[in-house]
């Protein structure tokens, strides 16, 4: 059974299967547009140009 599976994978590699195209991994540009930028984050302080509370969605000069 293992030999048959190996032969099938050699003849028809998984990379030959076309992707459906609607998965997030297939559209990196769309994923970048979905991310919230630091300036639009609710904890962003425009005076200090950083977040008051550093968390996963916010970055800036104040956050490590």
Swiss-Prot record:
Originating species: Conus pulicarius (Flea-bitten cone)
Superkingdom of the organism of origin: Eukaryota
Entry protein name: Conotoxin Pu3.5
Disulphide bonds in the chain: 50-63, 51-58, 54-62
Lineage: Eukaryota, Metazoa, Spiralia, Lophotrochozoa, Mollusca
Propeptide: 17-49
Tissues in which the UniProt entry reports expression: Expressed by the venom duct.
Free-text note on domains in this protein's UniProt record: The cysteine framework is III (CC-C-C-CC).
Subcellular location as annotated: Secreted
Signal peptide per UniProt: 1-16
Family affiliation: Belongs to the conotoxin M superfamily.
UniProt xrefs under Pfam families: Conotoxin
GO (cellular component) term, any one: extracellular region
One term of GO molecular function: ion channel inhibitor activity
Keyword terms: Cleavage on pair of basic residues, Disulfide bond, Secreted, Signal, Toxin
